[in-house]
Regions:
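Single conserved hydrophobic/aromatic residue that forms the stacking wall/gate
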Residues: 314-333
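Substrate-binding/gating loop at the entrance of the active-site cleft, primarily
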Residues: 108-152, 157-167
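ALDH superfamily catalytic-core signature
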Residues: 8, 133-136, 140-151, 166, ...
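N-terminal Rossmann-like NAD(P)+-binding subdomain of aldehyde/semialdehyde dehydrogenases
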Residues: 1-116
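General beta-strand structural signal in soluble alpha/beta enzymes
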Residues: 104, 154-155, 186-189, 208-211, ...
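A structured beta-alpha segment of the ubiquitous adenosine-cofactor-binding alpha/beta core
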Residues: 112, 116-119, 186-204
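A glycine-rich helix N-cap at a beta->alpha junction
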Residues: 176-186
């Protein structure tokens, strides 16, 4: 493990950046709801104004990644089309439409006369987020951080450095123009700094890593900062017997084909035994017409699925109280 990942001490440049984010996070944590919404709208505006520069940066990243022979799935995540960028910009604005997550009373009860117990939501402080080569994640993470009154230190995959830099510059411009401290969002672009983040317990309040099991486990074992670990996704969808059939079909299809390369694209479909005959009768031709291959267990094969799931992929057993009759895995043809 030590040969793959090492935890260096942070250099002066990283310490300075981290301190700037920490100070900015204190200010933004005290910012009124309307001012945070205003900041998000400005951030979206500047992403639009810098669309050309962002797409050009992404084109350069993509060319370099192709030359390195990066797998197609990663290339798909790296590619930022104008449509995907516009969707991300729209997402930033929609985050502003969410209810204010700050200062919400979750629990309030009188323990005894004059003694009130109250639990309220407050900003965490500074988030350290390590993620894969998916530039649209920069917009999503940054907008959620600002909306919730937090600062954020970002480290994306090196394959997307040019794109991430262009996006963060636009977001920082928006923050500045809205009257907030642009240092609330910081991007790291080298591997050494991403590992040195683990020694920034005086500056970072929570680390959120997205990557391999090995990376997530290493981070959890080599930092004193709280870690919200994420590695393997569940990627399951369950169709209940009381589900709206048409809605279930639409959700099942969209969750697979809308962005198949995404880490949260559906891989496994579980169908309640009572609705399975009707659901699969409509689902099978729908999936086939969209180039989705279904493989399933013995009982789903009886209902029309043609390809049997390998026992090396799934373990089929008869539960004490069976809820499902279908264990079907989605995979593209």
């Amino acid at each position: 493990m030590a040969n793959i990942f090492e935890v260096p001490q942070p250099g002066n440049d990283l310490l300075e950046k981290a301190d700037q984010v920490r100070l900015a996070s204190i200010k933004i944590s005290q910012t009124e709801n309307q001012n945070r919404i205003k900041a998000l709208n400005f951030m979206a505006d500047y992403l639009e104004k810098n669309t050309k520069e962002i797409l050009e940066a992404n084109s350069e990243d993509y060319k370099r990644a192709e030359k390195k022979g990066i797998p197609k799935a990663l290339l798909s995540r790296l590619k930022l089309s104008k449509e995907k960028l516009n969707s991300g910009i729209d997402g930033v604005r929609k985050v502003g439409d969410l209810a204010d997550p700050v200062d919400q009373v979750q629990i309030k009860r009188e323990l005894s006369k004059g003694l009130i117990l109250e639990r309220k939501t407050v900003p965490i402080g500074v988030l350290g987020v390590i993620f894969e080569s998916r530039p649209d994640a920069v917009m999503q993470i940054s907008s959620l951080a600002i909306r919730s009154g937090n600062g954020v230190i970002l480290k994306g995959g090196s394959e997307a450095n040019y794109t991430n830099t262009a996006i963060v510059e636009a977001l920082q411009q928006g923050l500045h123009e809205s009257g907030l401290d642009k240092n609330a969002i910081c991007l790291l672009t080298n591997r050494k700094d991403s590992m040195a983040m683990l020694n920034l317990e005086k500056y970072i309040n929570l680390i959120i890593p997205r990557g391999s099991n090995e990376l997530v486990k290493f981070i959890q074992e080599n930092t004193r900062i709280p870690v919200l670990g994420h590695a393997d996704g569940i990627c399951h969808l369950f169709i209940d017997n009381e589900a709206d059939l048409e809605m279930a079909l639409a959700v099942a299809l969209d969750s697979k084909i809308q962005y198949p390369a995404a880490c949260n694209a559906i891989e496994t479909l579980l169908v309640h035994r009572d609705i399975a005959p009707v659901f699969l009768k409509k689902a099978i031709p729908l999936f086939n017409s969209n180039d989705v291959k279904l493989i399933g267990d013995e009982r789903s094969l009886e209902l029309g699925i043609k390809h049997e799931a390998s026992l090396s992929l799934i373990h089929i057993s008869e539960p004490t109280r069976p809820l499902y009759i279908s264990y079907a895995v989605f995979c593209l043809k």
